[in-house]
Amino acid sequence: MNKVFICGSLEPGRDGVGDYSRRLAAALIQRGAQVALLAFNDSYIDGISLTEQVQGEFHIPVLRIGKDESAGKRISEAKKWIDQWDPEWLSLQFVPYAFHKKGLPWRLGKQMRKIGRGRKWHIMFHELWVEAGDARKQIVALLQRAIIKSLVSKLDPLIAHTNLP
């Protein structure tokens, strides 16, 4: 099985979902899978970095794209790298704030569809939306729910999970 996990950032020890993805990738590699990681909106780097990250005894191929890169550049670099890697599965590790500073990644579904056209999708929803509170939070929560529905509609994942009860 050849799989790419896509998350916001992959700075070791600074991004919980990135750390989770790295540990999961290492566990799958240990079982014989080929796995790579893509940080599509990395807050901890400038530019684009093609490297490896180490988890235990495993070296994991990584593409990190800085958050300040244009959407077009992020899409083209990610698509080129994914096409070279040629994974059977793409796994989006979704946290709204990982892909947009205000937690409203409106274009994420369209962007992911462009980089992963014709591939099988899995989505892991680590956080769904902010808890309702004041009027502003209620509006953000409604918008985040709409974004999630759009994301599912655009990617049509074969599998979706959440870690929330």
Q: What are the language-model segments listed below?
A:
Residues 1-14, 90-96:
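Nucleotide-activated donor-dependent transferases that construct or modify glycoconjugates
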Residues 3, 34-36, 121:
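Hydrophobic anchor at the start of a short beta-strand
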Residues 7-8, 12-13, 26-85:
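N-terminal strand-loop element at the rim of the active site
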Residues 13-27, 104-108, 143:
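Conserved alpha-helical elements of sugar-nucleotide-dependent glycosyltransferases
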Residues 64, 79-105, 119-124, 157-162:
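Short N-terminal targeting/anchoring amphipathic segment
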Residues 110-117, 139-160:
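Membrane-proximal helix-turn-helix segments that form the acceptor-binding/catalytic region
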Residues 119-146:
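Acceptor-binding helix/loop patch of EC 2.4 sugar-transfer enzymes
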